[in-house]
Amino acid sequence: MNVALVALSKPSASTGCNTADEFIAYCARVSNPDNQNNNKTAPGLLKYLIKHGHWSPFEMVSLTMEIQTTRDISHQIVRHRSFSFQEFSQRYAVTNVFQIREARLQDEKNRQNSIALDYHNNCHRRINERFQMAQTKVLRTARDAYESALEDGIAKEQARALLPEGMSGTTLYMAGTLRSWIHYCDLRRANGTQQEHAEIAERCWSIIGDHFPSVRKAVDDLNNS
């Protein structure tokens, strides 16, 4: 898994804003032009907007992230319909990036949750070894069949049916407003999200915090209150 910021709205010099945080406050003050360039109080205004659910100013800036993951996780990500996506096409290009996954146990109380193995437990270590061996065997067979199909002239869009989605790597670009990113990160960092997806959301939130520190602090403070 890897996440990187590849694009971010940048305020023009005419706004007098130095940061994206300040630009959100600038847009929020559209009805108060005499105070629109008051960057000093921008953090306080952002905190107020978040606390009281005034989200429209956060739609004035957008971010695009590059996400490298597996296709089963990307299927979960693209369900967030307020975003725009571009994803690696298995119809157009040959898949040659694969990943062996870790073993986790099913949570019997929550079907959407898994439980980490205890590697001090001999039984759990054997479970992990069997799972790793099974994946290696499946992947070797699938890759051999996939490559043979391509050599026989089978179209990529058909040959991809031979590949296990949970081990097939993909890259996608995910673009959305800051409002959408806040909602996505809140939802997907919470309990009930698959661990691999939650790790992506955590990384996205960390990146957002680097560029919107006042926003991140206000959201985190609200969630922890």
Model-predicted segments: where are they?
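Family-specific signature for flavin-dependent thymidylate synthase
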Residues: M1-S225
